[in-house]
Amino acid sequence: MDRRKRKTRKAIFDACVALMKEKEFQNITVNEIVERADINRGTFYLHFVDKYDMMNSFENEMIEKIEDVMLNNIPKKQFEELFIQSRYDTVVEILKCYEQNKELLHLLMRSSHSASFQAKLRDKLEFVVTEKIFPNFENLELQI
């Protein structure tokens, strides 16, 4: 994504976060978002279909960040010897990711879409653990 698009998406994101601090997501309009972001409505619609598409996009970006942290902290060799240390390192990295994105995570968890976000996050965590971390363990049941 080019720099201008990233800058515009960040402005939209920051505007949405600021508005979500003031009121519930379902009460926020696209007009309010574009006014706060200082962009045109047309620019908003170049990036998103509607505010729900925007929220879905932000949720997916957050889930991808968490997945990347988890996958980048799985040792490729000497898995058994490093497993305990790697779990610690992975948790530390997930907590860093949370710290860097705590405002968004807090707003996503308390928004009217929190059940959707939590389900997506749970599904992604389950996939990473069962398919990437423990792919050879059959019948591994997780309760996340």
Regions found by a protein language model. Name each.
Residues 11-18, 36, 53-73, 89, ...:
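Alpha-helical structural segments
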Residues 19-52:
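Helix-turn-helix
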Residues 71-101:
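Hydrophobic alpha-helical connector segments
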Residues 92-119:
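Amphipathic alpha-helical segments used for helix-helix packing
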